[in-house]
């Protein structure tokens, strides 16, 4: 087959214009390979400008690139390795391994631009996805094949929560996880990789990184690379896959940079006019089909804490559940620091989770909400000024608050406490006993950092016998 060869005619930062022979223009989203100075630069066709010229976005550095250099049309989009051979490896946006462990034994190579599953193939996300983490399973349950937004500032435990989820799906469900670092700090990616190696989770995980120092084209496409690898496990192997994207805001930010470089007129707050379309193209591919499911957990940075900013606001429309991590809760020493009143889930509905789960979850939230309202009175006047009924609510709320904490497997080395995976039925039973007053005689410290309610009983009875 004869190669379709063009020549570089203009370079503006990461944007490269290439002229091809008349009638031989490569299609939009095709990968173009540019060979110069012993390097290969891959760019992606973004626009047809007329005069047989295409405008491409480079996925690597254009340093040293000159006009007149040959550019070869590969005839299709970027293709990345998929299959079991990708597990335990680290890739860049082009699907090239960056962990110095040699070639990848790929089952196949798939293009990163693919259509979302058709309407007939999709299955609505109404089945609960058990994470083994009490606060999530009870108050903001994840849907199998759903999309979850993880909101939180620096140092409240986003990465630890992500690692625990990866560990739980690997050991309890035997499933695979794909972690995609989009515009991430390289140091954080390195920490994650080292911690995964230590905890043994790496064998069931694929890591894909497009860091902060990469050109915007790479940061914009790296999420699609990770998603394509996840789609293989869903569509061919019929697996339930977990896809982590950290951070979805950086994906939008990279799209905004590329949009400006391509000369598009910016929209609200300077974002790209194609914002909703770009986010939709990614999110619509993350779904359950008749074969398997992709459940995605997406860390979301909120610029200036403004939830009405177009980036988080557009992402919200796609989410099924939100897990909000709170600094106030972390300061109390309660981990995971999930805010039980701010976190929400679309499937916390009696028709999906059942009457008992719904009743227990809502009662727990009512008690915590009432405790929050009473805190000002307690701070000023003390506990003695409360009515007996309110005192009881405060005592139960403090037990609930502590019982929402849980020792994590991935944090064993730091806490010295063995991790706990709590089944959903045990979670519901435990909180039901607290709200029904069956645990009123047990002091609150026994509820801190335990798994099931049976552990609370055991520890209390052991101490009583000791006395």
Swiss-Prot record:
The protein's enzyme class: translocase
Claim: Isomerase is one of the keywords in the record: no
EC number(s) stated in the UniProt entry for this protein: 7.1.2.2
The name this protein goes by in its record: ATP synthase subunit beta
GO terms of molecular function: ATP binding; ATP hydrolysis activity; proton-transporting ATP synthase activity, rotational mechanism
Classification via Pfam families: ATP-synt_ab (PF00006), ATP-synt_ab_N (PF02874), ATP-synt_VA_C (PF22919)
Gene this protein is translated from: atpD
Residues annotated for ATP binding in this entry: 152-159
Quaternary structure, from the entry: F-type ATPases have 2 components, CF(1) - the catalytic core - and CF(0) - the membrane proton channel. CF(1) has five subunits: alpha(3), beta(3), gamma(1), delta(1), epsilon(1). CF(0) has three main subunits: a(1), b(2) and c(9-12). The alpha and beta chains form an alternating ring which encloses part of the gamma chain. CF(1) is attached to CF(0) by a central stalk formed by the gamma and epsilon chains, while a peripheral stalk is formed by the delta and b chains.
Reaction(s) this enzyme catalyzes, per UniProt: ATP + H2O + 4 H(+)(in) = ADP + phosphate + 5 H(+)(out)
Record keywords, A-Z: ATP synthesis, ATP-binding, Cell membrane, CF(1), Hydrogen ion transport, Ion transport, Membrane, Nucleotide-binding, Translocase, Transport
Top-level taxon of origin: Bacteria
UniProt family annotation: Belongs to the ATPase alpha/beta chains family.
Function: Produces ATP from ADP in the presence of a proton gradient across the membrane. The catalytic sites are hosted primarily by the beta subunits.
Organism, as annotated: Caldicellulosiruptor saccharolyticus (strain ATCC 43494 / DSM 8903 / Tp8T 6331)
């Amino acid at each position: 087959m004869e190669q379709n060869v063009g020549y570089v005619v203009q370079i503006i930062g990461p944007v490269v214009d290439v002229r091809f022979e008349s009638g031989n223009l490569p299609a939009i989203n095709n990968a173009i390979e540019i060979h110069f100075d012993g390097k290969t630069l891959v760019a992606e066709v973004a626009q047809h400008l007329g005069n047989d010229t295409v405008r491409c976005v480079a996925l690597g550095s254009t340093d040293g690139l000159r006009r007149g250099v040959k550019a070869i049309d590969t005839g299709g989009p970027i293709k990345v390795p998929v299959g079991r051979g990708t597990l335990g490896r680290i890739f860049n946006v082009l699907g090239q391994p960056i962990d110095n462990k040699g070639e990848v034994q790929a089952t196949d190579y798939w293009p990163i631009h693919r259509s979302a599953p058709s309407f007939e193939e999709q299955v609505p996300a109404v089945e609960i996805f058990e994470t083994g983490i009490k606060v999530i399973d009870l108050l903001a349950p994840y849907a199998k094949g759903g999309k979850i937004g993880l909101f939180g500032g620096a140092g409240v435990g986003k990465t630890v929560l992500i690692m625990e989820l990866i560990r739980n799906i690997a050991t309890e469900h035997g499933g695979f996880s794909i972690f995609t670092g989009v515009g991430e700090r390289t140091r954080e990616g390195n920490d994650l990789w080292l911690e995964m190696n230590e905890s043994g989770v790496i064998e069931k995980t694929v890591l894909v990184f497009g860091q902060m120092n990469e050109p915007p084209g790479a940061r914009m496409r790296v999420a699609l690379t990770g998603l394509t690898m996840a789609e293989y496990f869903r569509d061919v192997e019929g697996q339930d896959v977990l896809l982590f994207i950290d951070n979805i805001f950086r994906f939008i930010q990279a799209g905004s940079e590329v949009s400006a470089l391509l000369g598009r007129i910016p929209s609200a707050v300077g974002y790209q006019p194609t914002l909703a379309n770009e986010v939709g193209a990614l999110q619509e591919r993350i779904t359950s089909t008749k074969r398997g499911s992709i459940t995605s957990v997406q860390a979301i940075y909120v610029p200036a804490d403004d939830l009405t900013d177009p980036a988080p606001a557009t992402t919200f429309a796609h989410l099924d559940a939100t897990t909000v991590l709170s600094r106030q809760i972390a300061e109390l020493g309660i981990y995971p620091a999930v805010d039980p009143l701010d976190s929400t889930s679309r499937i916390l509905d009696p028709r999906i989770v059942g009457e008992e789960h719904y009743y227990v979850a809502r009662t727990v939230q009512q008690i915590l909400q009432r405790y929050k309202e009473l805190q000002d009175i307690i701070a000023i006047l003390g506990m003695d000024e409360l009515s007996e009924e309110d005192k009881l609510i405060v005592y139960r709320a403090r037990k609930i608050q502590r019982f929402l904490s849980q020792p994590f497997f991935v944090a064993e080395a730091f806490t010295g406490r063995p991790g706990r995976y709590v089944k959903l039925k045990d979670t519901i039973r435990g909180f039901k006993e607290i709200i029904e007053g069956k645990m009123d005689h047990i002091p609150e410290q026994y509820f801190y950092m335990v798994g099931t309610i049976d552990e609370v009983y055991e520890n209390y009875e052991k101490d009583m016998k000791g006395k």
